[in-house]
Amino acid sequence: EKKFTSKGNIIGMGGSAGGLLMGAVVNQAPDLFLGIVMAVPFVDSLTTNLDHSLPLTVGEFDEFGNAKDKKEHFDYIFSYAPYNNIKKMDYPNILITTSLSDNRVLFDEPAKFTAKLRDYKTDNNLLLLKTEMNAGHGGKSGRDGAIEEIAVDYAFALKIAGKLNTWSWNIKINYHINIVSRLMGLAKINLLN
């Protein structure tokens, strides 16, 4: 109604269970999105739910159900689980981040999801997996670490929207960023060229 955006120009962002949402919607309606940013996404939700030895599985039955003991829960989770619903089709540009020390969404979930997506996607759009070696579920610690993660997400969004070619950007994504010019100033990027 307000025409803020249009089909194929949306960039969705979500982390953890929000990453689960992004994974589900990108499988169901990939043509709506220009890109997706998924931070520590819970994308292998069915496998995780079936493993009652994992620390958070049993405690999250109220939220996600118990696929191991209830067939209707299994069927429902399977219907939207991002990993289980990857199809041979075009996907938008996707940035996935994971953390090696994440004890909520183990790093192998996003890695496994990315590998399967690489095998199945039929397009040439970006599919990036960024692994933080010294971070947990909440990302890097400290102000600079949080700003760096935000900068990476926005640099990716600006890159796929075609805006990085018109500005002077130069961020080093894998290591140090010059604090994004006091939070939201201009910076430069190297990763996506």
Describe each model-derived feature in a short phrase:
Residues E1, L191-N193:
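Accessible peptide chain termini
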Residues E1-N170:
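Active-site-proximal cap/loop segments of hydrolase catalytic domains
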Residues Y175-H176, L186, L191:
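Short hydrophobic targeting helices and cationic amphipathic motifs
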